[in-house]
């Protein structure tokens, strides 16, 4: 079958036998379609990455693959599966359609994050969902200042703050009463976590902005990135966030709809049935 995706890497992090079985079955299917199936260590040479698992597996894979400009498609064998939108039972049919050119491509923004202490960079990383400043092990409120493009925005005492991409707006930020941002929106949203005030509300800004969060009077705080990378923060530390220069490309099968995913996965705007 002629296809733009000649070399395909399969990624599955879960130790479950079900994921292993799916990896094996999909590998056989791809070889039958004339594709070369690459080992995960060779993913930089792939034309397409197929991720089997849940959203956590997809987050890790996307951050690793984005610098190689390898598009990704997800097969859900996790819990929610908001980013891994192909059901396991539809795996062969959907991947076959994608190989035949029947698919849509969607670019998703990542956050480029940097932690600076005393003028020196401590950590740089990427996040597809969100960067979160949160209280540490002692459970005390954090106090921090937020700057947008160098302009002071607010100072807040709270459990922390979430800075989410449109992709991450349906994750942790949603649980904290943040807005849903469509993936095509060039925006970030800042969502306070349990603020010690009656007036703090989420705010969305252009993703061309540089966001800085500066720790004040907070001796016990942490920064989390996609819930997978972690760094301890000290008073005076600066967390600098901006849009990554490279987006990740998601491949979707025929019939994919973001709003259908919202309804099916999150029960978005579902009417309450009366008996």
Where do the model's predicted regions map?
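Gly/Ser/Thr-rich active-site loops/lids in small-molecule metabolic enzymes
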Residues: 155-199
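ATP/NTP phosphate-donor binding region
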Residues: 1-52, 60, 89-106, 115-125
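Catalytic core of DAGKc-family lipid kinases
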Residues: 82-159
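A residue-level signal for conserved active-site and pocket-lining positions in enzyme catalytic cores
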Residues: 13, 50, 76, 131, ...
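Proline-centered loop/turn at the N-terminus of a beta-strand
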Residues: 69-71, 189
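Short glycine-rich anion-binding loops that position phosphate/pyrophosphate groups of nucleotides
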Residues: 15, 55-57, 78-80, 167-169
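ATP/nucleoside-binding phosphotransfer catalytic cores, i.e., glycine-rich phosphate-binding loops
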Residues: 133, 149-152, 200-275
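Short, well-ordered beta-strand core segments
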Residues: 49, 72, 161-162
């Amino acid at each position: 079958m002629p296809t733009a995706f000649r070399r395909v890497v399969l990624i599955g992090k879960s130790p479950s036998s079900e994921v292993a079985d799916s990896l094996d079955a999909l590998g056989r299917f791809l070889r039958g379609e004339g594709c070369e199936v690459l080992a995960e260590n060779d993913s930089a040479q792939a034309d397409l990455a197929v991720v089997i698992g849940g959203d956590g597996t997809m987050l890790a894979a996307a951050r690793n693959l984005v610098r190689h400009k390898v598009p990704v498609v997800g097969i859900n064998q996790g819990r929610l599966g908001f980013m891994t939108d192909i059901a396991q039972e539809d795996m062969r049919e959907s991947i076959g359609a994608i190989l035949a050119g029947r698919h849509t491509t969607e670019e998703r923004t990542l956050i480029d994050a940097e932690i600076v202490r005393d003028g020196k960079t401590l950590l740089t990383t990427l996040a597809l969902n969100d960067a979160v400043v949160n209280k540490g092990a002692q459970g005390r409120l954090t106090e921090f200042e937020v700057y947008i493009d160098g302009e002071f925005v607010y100072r807040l005492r709270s459990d922390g703050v979430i800075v989410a991409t449109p992709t991450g707006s349906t994750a942790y930020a949603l649980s904290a009463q943040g807005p849903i941002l469509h993936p095509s929106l060039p925006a970030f949203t800042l969502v306070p976590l349990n603020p010690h005030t009656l007036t703090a509300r989420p705010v969305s800004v252009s993703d061309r902005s540089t966001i800085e969060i500066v720790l004040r009077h907070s001796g016990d705080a942490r920064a989390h990135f996609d819930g997978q990378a972690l760094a301890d923060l000290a008073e005076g530390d600066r967390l600098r966030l901006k849009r990554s220069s490279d987006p990740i490309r998601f491949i979707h099968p025929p019939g994919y709809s973001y709003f259908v995913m919202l309804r099916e996965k999150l029960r978005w705007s579902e009417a309450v049935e009366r008996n």
